[in-house]
Amino acid sequence: PLHRLHDEEVVRLLESGQRREELTGLLGADGYRELSSLAREAAKARHRGGQVVYVLPGLMGSRIGTRGRLLDDVIWLDPIEVAAGHLTRLALPRGSRLAALGVMLLNALKLKLTLQIAGFDARLHAYDWRRSVERLADELLARIESDGVQSPMLVGHSMGGVVARVALAADRGRIARAVQLGAPNSGSFAPVLAMRGVYPTVRKLAALDLRHDAEDLARIVFRTLPSLHELLPDADLTDGANLFDSSEWPDDALRP
């Protein structure tokens, strides 16, 4: 299935025009036209030997599941798994064996291809967005070391920008620059909405889930994720309310 393919495989399909109808269904007509054009242009660009740029997607922007010998078992985000009620497998710590399998491609792939056209050696960096930001920054630094890359740049969207900032602060000698795109450095209300079961994405997932409603998903899954707790808004965004103190939340089953 296309949603299980990695970015290099999708780029090859976009360049060649193969499986056009399926890709259009996945990316939308406008998305397919834009990405196929960018893929062909990037193929002509000389980006080998250019400065390495790691592209980090935002919150919920990486696929989560388990790796298989032939096919990965994708939980986030596979509509069949959602309908079967398997999103509850994402809850922590019970779902600790799950890992990031790749990046949700539409926006991240556009950024990667645009950077390649500009001459950069752009690489997508998937991460398990359920985890703490500090842990994810450490994993990013470990990947950079494993890749043997000297002085890369980081470009992070949303939560990815926060991970990039923390990685830069942890090892300024290793990273040349970090660029943030809409990063919630003072926190965000999105985690609040997710943990209350009213975030639009949670509502859409609940509409597909045949076994759980939005409050179930918030209670069982989203309030167990360290990343959402760490990205809660600072008090200066909440008129002084300290959302890091559970007593400030409604006294119900969804209280963190």
Predicted feature locations:
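Glycine-rich, aromatic-lined ligand/substrate-binding cores of catalytic
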Residues: 220-256
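N-terminal non-catalytic accessory region
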Residues: 1-215, 222
